[in-house]
Amino acid sequence: MEMKTDAKIRVRLESFNHELLNSSCQKIVNILQNTLSNSIGVITLPTRKRIYCVLRSPHVDKDSREHFEIRTHKRILEIYYNSEVPIFDLLSEADLPPGVFYRICLS
């Protein structure tokens, strides 16, 4: 039996912790593969690295500085599915951990 893929959903996941992000992606993929036979692709996007330079001294000694960085890891899940299936109910069932931000785009 051939399944028609009428619609596509992109779920964009972002997190500062790459282990949380990978486990969240795997959790969503497992939920969707256990209930549906659709095609799911995980795309890894480049990590954004923000570096902040802070002076250690309050008013003098500009040579003494400290650098801090924040890395934002990103993934995109492309889900092709049949439009008759309630895909949003399955995605809301995923219960992602705090610290993982997600956006859902329909196309």
From Swiss-Prot:
Subcellular location: Plastid, Chloroplast
Keywords in alphabetical order: Chloroplast, Plastid, Ribonucleoprotein, Ribosomal protein
InterPro entries: Ribosomal_uS10, Ribosomal_uS10_dom, Ribosomal_uS10_dom_sf
GO biological process: translation
Molecular function GO terms recorded: structural constituent of ribosome; tRNA binding
UniProt main location, coarse: plastid
GO cellular component terms given for this protein: chloroplast; ribonucleoprotein complex; ribosome
Similarity remark: Belongs to the universal ribosomal protein uS10 family.
Subunit and partners: Part of the 30S ribosomal subunit.
Cited function: Involved in the binding of tRNA to the ribosomes.
Protein name in the entry: Small ribosomal subunit protein uS10c
Gene designation: rps10
